[in-house]
Amino acid sequence: MKKELTRRSFLKLAGAGALAVAMSGSLTGCDVIENLKDMDSVSAAIGDVKFMLSASAWTNGVGGQENDVTYQPTCEIRNNSKKAVTYGGIGSNCEVIITGVLTDKNGKEYPMTYAGENGSAPAGEKYEVKDFKLVAVGKKLYMEGSKVVTTFTYKGKKGCLYRV
């Protein structure tokens, strides 16, 4: 028996697929997620502001019983809004709050704090955050086999960027 895919059936299936992809962001708690592993960069857009991470560097710090892991990607903010947007860590009173979670090779999660300087991305421009840095601290914590989720919270919405 030969099965034919009609134009109408194709459009229904394509619409269902597009809806499934769009809804995957709501399942993870993020509004817009874009993962571009082939291009070695990831980006997320919230309204008129787009956040991009690429070319990451990891460092292990050594301290007594605890180690810190520093994650330093190249971070760019494309601000297509009509006014400058401020960014910083938790407690900075900035419009964009930057946080992260590091998951080690055993699946244990460590909160990451933004350790760069607070700043402002000018309106209508692509802006590189010069000292973007997230730091996690934990016992016997090392970067090998770890992954990071960086979260940008802006106007009550979250954009999550995944790096393995």
Regions found by a protein language model. Give the residues of each.
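N-terminal secretory signal peptides and thylakoid transit peptides that target proteins
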Residues: K2-A18
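Bacterial Sec-type N-terminal signal peptides, specifically the leucine/valine-rich hydrophobic h-region
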Residues: S24-L27
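Low-complexity, acidic Ser/Thr/Pro/Gly-rich terminal tails and inter-domain linkers that flank the onset
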Residues: L36-E66
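Short, solvent-exposed loop/turn segments enriched in Ser/Thr/Gly
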Residues: N67-T74
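Asparagine-centered strand-capping/turn motif at beta-strand->loop junctions
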Residues: I77-S81
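Short, hydrophobic/aromatic beta-strand segments
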Residues: K83-S92
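Short, solvent-exposed, Trp/other aromatic-anchored flexible loops in extracytoplasmic proteins
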Residues: G107-F152
